[in-house]
Amino acid sequence: FAIDKFDQTTFNLLTMLDSLDKFQTIADGNIIVKLHPGEMAVMREYVGPLAQQALEIFSKKYEFTPKGPILIEMFPKHDDFAVRTVGLPGMIGALGACFGRVVTLDSPKARPPGDFNWAPTLWHELGHVMTLQLSKQRVPRWLTEGISVYEEKLGSPAWGREGELTFAMAYGQGEHMSLRELNAAFQDPEKISLAYYEAS
């Protein structure tokens, strides 16, 4: 705040970091998980083991061990996740994000019951850990998203995104995307769901 006491992003980040200081931490090998104290008792049993499983599978498949530690932060308030990720509240539609060695995501409390499943979101973001590190952060978005969605489907049959009908209709109407158009489609709210499916 030394330069601008009214900078909204700085204010948001400092406020969020104050709440993040109260989170509890679990360290398991190359993985560090930060959880809200109110969720620790339940989520500690699931988050670390699922992350370990995903990274073991990916490391074997891609013949690459990601540099760690890998930090996973789960937020019970979506706006805290958004501020931690981009500095501002909102981020409508986003459930998780990855920066190579840092994964942020909504916890189950951040959404209405039954609205989303945190496990495929974590699996998806850990897929990004692999692609971002393997490419030294130089992978096109369509490719990293495509690999993560593909890996979600392999992680559990229940996790696959439903997109066959939407894709078939777009394809039948000549509205599917070419490889050249795919990256830009991730910036278009009307095309992003189809872009995730096509990329996978």
For each of these PLM feature ranges, what is it?
Residues F1-M16:
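Alpha-helical protein-protein interaction scaffolds
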Residues L14-Q24:
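Short domain-boundary/entry signatures in modular proteins, especially
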Residues F23-R141, E151-G160, F167-Y196:
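Juxtacatalytic substrate-recognition/specificity segment
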Residues T144:
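Peptidyl-prolyl cis-trans isomerase
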Residues A199-S200:
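Acidic, S/T/G-rich, low-cysteine, solvent-exposed domains in lumenal/extracellular/periplasmic regions
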